[in-house]
């Protein structure tokens, strides 16, 4: 996302994250010198307030806020059936899931849902300031888009199966609905809220899924995945996500509000889902 926005020469990009080395790694992949790193823990209101003040000291407004933090936590899924198809005892299912510390479940919710929520709230004044800078409307002239929030969810939020974690799926279902509620809450303030729900993209979080499927590399070439798993037969690429973000951020995306945009190669079409 940062690379795509930088390549399209936005004026400033502030990136927030806990790890300084990760922030610097992101900057090293950009070319236009627009990226400003700020260390921040989105699970801390005090840290978010400090980050907001740091951004506000360097700009008068924010046109686009992307809440992109997320964690999967440890595996929290039912035990698999035996080779003969027989189910494991319910007591085994109960013990395996119940023995996971509640704090592990709460951490996933705290980062993916609570952290996103408070990140949006923290930066509302700068989003409002962006709208106040918009020029007066002119007849038959398309105005610049209003301020926007984009929250990253996941197709896991629509999945009825649990390939990895009850906590992760539940958190992304909550994130998806959070997008819709915030869109309604801010509609009359002129602040748009949209969500993106990626499928399988090569990333630190998804690498274990790729490995479990015997997938090597980024898996972006056709035929990398069976059609039964992903109809497009490949994982998502940087270009897929970059194009979506740039479109949403541009005038062409200015009429989009309250939407959840899937980018999954058709994965949700062939899996039990609530979409």
Please give the residue ranges for each predicted region.
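Short, small/polar-rich loop/turn modules that mediate ligand/substrate recognition or access, typified
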Residues: 192, 256-258
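Short, flexible catalytic-loop segment of classical short-chain dehydrogenase/reductase
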Residues: 197-208, 212
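Catalytic loop of short-chain dehydrogenase/reductase
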Residues: 71, 76-109, 125-188, 200-201
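Catalytic Tyr-x(3-8)-Lys segment
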Residues: 212-239
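Canonical Rossmann dinucleotide-binding motif of NAD(H)/NADP(H)-dependent dehydrogenases/reductases
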Residues: 1-14
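Rossmann-fold cofactor-recognition segment
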Residues: 30-46
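A glycine-rich helix->loop->beta "capping" turn
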Residues: 32-36, 53-67, 72-79, 101, ...
């Amino acid at each position: 996302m940062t690379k795509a926005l930088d390549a399209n020469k936005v004026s400033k990009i502030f990136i927030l994250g806990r790890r300084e080395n990760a922030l610097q790694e992101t900057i090293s992949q950009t070319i236009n010198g627009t990226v400003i790193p700020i260390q921040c823990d989105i699970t801390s209101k005090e840290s978010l307030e400090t980050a907001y003040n740091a951004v506000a000291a360097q700009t008068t407004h924010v046109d686009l806020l992307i809440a992109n933090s997320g964690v999967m936590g440890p595996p929290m899924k039912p035990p698999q059936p035996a080779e003969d198809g027989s189910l494991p005892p319910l007591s085994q299912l109960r013990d395996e899931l119940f023995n996971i510390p509640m704090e592990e479940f709460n951490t996933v919710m705290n980062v993916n849902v609570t952290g996103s929520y408070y990140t949006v709230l923290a930066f509302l004044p700068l989003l409002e300031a962006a709208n106040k800078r918009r020029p007066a409307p002119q007849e038959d002239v398309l105005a610049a888009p209003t301020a926007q929030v984009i929250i990253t969810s996941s197709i896991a939020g629509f999945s009825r199966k649990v390939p990895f974690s009850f906590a992760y799926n539940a958190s992304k279902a909550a994130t998806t609905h959070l997008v819709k509620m915030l869109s309604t809450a801010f509609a009359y303030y002129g602040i748009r809220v949209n969500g993106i729900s990626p499928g399988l993209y090569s990333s630190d979080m998804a690498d274990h899924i790729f490995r479990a499927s015997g997938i090597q590399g980024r898996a972006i070439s056709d035929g990398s995945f069976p059609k039964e798993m992903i109809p497009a037969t490949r994982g998502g690429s940087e270009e897929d996500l970059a194009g979506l973000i740039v479109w949403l951020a541009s005038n062409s995306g200015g009429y989009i509000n309250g939407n959840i945009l899937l980018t999954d190669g058709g994965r949700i079409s062939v899996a039990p889902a609530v979409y």
